[in-house]
From Swiss-Prot:
Organism: Borrelia recurrentis (strain A1)
InterPro entries: DNA_mismatch_repair_CS, DNA_mismatch_repair_MutL, DNA_mismatch_S5_2-like, HATPase_C_sf, MutL/Mlh/PMS, MutL/Mlh/Pms-like, MutL_C, MutL_C_dimsub
Entry protein name: DNA mismatch repair protein MutL
Taxonomy, superkingdom: Bacteria
Keywords for the protein's UniProt record, in alphabetical order: DNA damage, DNA repair
SUPFAM superfamilies: ATPase domain of HSP90 chaperone/DNA topoisomerase II/histidine kinase, DNA mismatch repair protein MutL, Ribosomal protein S5 domain 2-like
Gene transcribed to yield this protein: mutL
Coiled-coil positions: none
HAMAP family per the UniProt record, alphabetical: DNA_mis_repair
Length: 611
């Protein structure tokens, strides 16, 4: 009797499905790949109960014809490749023809689709078997609805995490697809609540939108490079935003997230001179590689990759990052030298006022080259552009020819409130603290008794402005010319409409003219000249505020008007901020972030073994 036998067809499909689909986020990844490959520029995702109960994706892509819809769920059916040679030049995210068949085996699957100008059709598959196929109301693109995941795989279902954890995994996949496709509008709803919205933007802006919350003030550095068969973009944070694990090192090759140890190690090596042991950088690497030099067909979920004839790549990544920080270090030292000279030559200690010239623009550009034999210690030919995005946006930039008085400067920052605070004076330094100076154009260093404070100048100034706004006497001010504006997102439109009466309570009159179109008619007097910020606040509404609209709005205004990182401020204004810090005992900015970090003399002495 033969011991070896052919497996049942259904069992074979279940085994294959288990390799490609192991949890809800795997389904989401495959369906997003299909939507992106369809040429869609708008994709919406709906998740319920961590994706276990339901994952619904709609797109406005090219759609599926009636004939293709009838067979799209069968194993190894695909429109992406035709022959073996196609595996060497894969341009799409999907290509194996396994995704829909695997999903159909382990869930209930319903697909509705149409090609432009043709009727829509719907097919439902249960446990891999077609349940029905019918004509459907016309839609633009494709809708894929997956329900009851693993209902026929009880063993696999038992190993799923609780809904909240599965939701986080789905969110991670959603963000990875969104960040690598900035030319697509993405929208995510979880349990019928809108969670994420990303509109079309540049890659740099999309990185800020998706990952900007990891660091304060969205301060990313950027390197761009191009070599034979490779285009490279690296986004990274300053050294002070290091992490204790590697989770924020992300690598994308041809718009796919991958796990490649050699590349992650090259990123870590590039930061080795600026990060201490067991600290890891926050870094996002984007590579576009000629398809003949890369193979994704080595892992069921395409998480691994094999490179051909690119031995220089890891070293190049490391060298570029190292050289970037070497140049930054030299600039910091030079800037420090310039500041010392300016302190000696100026009486009023106004330092480094922003100017509209290249030296103070928002981007610093460097060029590196690559030598011919690909030994990359000192590249020579191809250009690398390093950009540091300071995002300094000071209301009314000041030229050197005109320097306003201190009082004028403060009045502008404090939005011309009706009464200036009593401590807006050219006061000398108090005896309670000793101001040591400004660090990295970001922190104020203060000695107080036996303690040293590192105070975040932006967070502190933001809190002071916020309290001034909240506590000021307000009157309603009618705009001479009402401002009309539109919101692009339907969910934002619904939220804004529901909040119109709440805005009236804080002296903001905004009326809805028609669908997604509004008119701003009145604002509080203290918000004079900041209509644009208020309108931007309206346009970015993503969820209803639980606590207070007034709190959220004034926190936004304060954040936009406060001094930023890399703003060098006068000695007098620094002392004013520090006085307010100690007098008001401020601890957190309006958004909840800590304002300062404190080190005691004992802790400092202990760190150098003096205790």
């Amino acid at each position: 009797m033969n011991k070896i036998k052919f497996l049942d067809k259904t069992l074979v499909q279940k085994i294959a499905a288990g390799e490609a689909i192991d949890r809800p986020c795997s389904i989401l990844r495959e369906l997003l790949d299909n939507a992106i490959d369809s040429g869609a520029d708008k994709i919406e995702v709906f998740i319920e109960e961590g994706g276990i109960r339901r994952i619904l994706i709609t797109d406005n892509g090219s759609g599926i014809s009636k004939e293709d819809l009838k067979i799209c769920y069968l194993p190894h059916t695909t429109s992406k490749i035709n022959e073996e040679k196609d595996l060497e030049r894969i341009q799409t995210l999907g290509f194996r023809g396994e995704a829909l068949s695997s999903i159909a085996i382990c869930s209930n699957l319903m697909i509705t689709s149409s090609i432009t100008g043709e009727n829509s059709y719907q097919i439902e598959i249960e446990n891999g078997i077609e349940k029905y196929f019918k004509k459907q109301s016309a839609i633009n693109g494709t809708m894929v609805d997956v329900t009851n995941l693993f209902h026929n795989f009880p063993a696999r279902k038992r190993f799923l995490k609780k809904d909240s954890i599965e939701t986080k995994m789905c969110l991670k996949v959603f963000e990875e697809k969104a960040v690598t496709h900035p030319g697509i509008d993405f929208k995510l709803s979880v349990n019928k609540e809108l969670k994420k919205v990303y509109f079309k933007e540049s890659l740099a802006d999309r990185v800020q939108s998706v990952y900007g919350e990891i660091i304060e003030n969205n301060k990313f550095g950027k390197i761009e490079a191009e070599y034979d068969h490779v285009k490279m973009k690296i986004f990274f944070t300053p050294p002070n935003f290091s992490r204790k694990d590697r989770r924020n090192i992300k690598i994308f090759v041809n718009r796919r997230p991958i796990e490649e140890k050699s590349l992650s190690e090259s990123i870590i090596n590039g930061h080795s001179r600026i990060l201490t042991y067991k600290n890891f950088p926050v870094c996002y690497l984007f590579l576009e590689i000629d398809t003949t030099h890369v193979d994704f067909n080595i892992h069921p979920q395409k998480k691994e990759v094999r490179f051909f004839n690119l031995p220089f790549l890891p070293k190049q990544i490391s060298n570029n990052i190292n050289e970037f920080f070497d140049r930054e270090k030299q600039e910091i030292l030079q800037d420090y030298h310039n500041v010392i000279i300016k302190r000696q030559l100026t009486n009023d200690a106004h330092l480094l006022h922003p100017e509209n010239d290249l030296t103070n623009s928002n981007f610093k550009t460097y060029e590196i080259t690559q030598d011919e034999d690909l030994i990359l210690d000192k590249p020579k030919n191809n250009k690398v552009t390093n950009i540091i995005e300071d995002k300094v946006k000071f209301e009314g930039q000041i030229s050197q020819k005109y320097k306003p008085s201190f009082k004028q400067h403060i009045q502008k920052i404090f939005i011309k409130t009706s009464k200036m605070p009593n401590n807006f004076q050219k006061s000398t330094q108090t005896n309670e603290f000793k101001y040591m100076g400004q660090l990295f154009s970001e922190f104020l260093i203060v000695e107080n008794a036996n303690e040293i404070y590192f105070i975040d100048q932006h967070a502190l100034h933001e809190k002071i402005i916020y309290q001034t706004l909240i506590n000021s006497e307000k009157t309603i001010q009618k705009l001479l010319v009402p401002i009309e504006f539109q919101v692009e997102c339907e969910d934002t439109d619904k939220i804004l409409t529901s909040e119109l009466e709440e805005y009236k309570k804080i002296d903001i009159i905004v009326k809805k003219i028609q669908n997604q179109t509004y008119r701003l008619e009145s604002i509080p007097n203290i918000c004079n000249k900041y209509e644009n910020i208020i309108i931007q606040f309206f346009k970015t509404r993503k969820s209803k505020i639980i606590d207070s609209l007034e709190t959220e709005l004034y926190a936004t205004l304060a954040c936009r008007q406060a001094i930023k990182c890399n703003d060098t401020i006068s000695l007098e204004f620094s002392q004013f901020l520090i006085n307010e810090f100690f007098n008001l005992k401020l601890k957190h900015c309006p958004h909840g972030r800590k304002i300062y970090h404190k080190i005691t003399k004992f802790e400092l002495e202990k760190s150098v073994n003096r205790q």
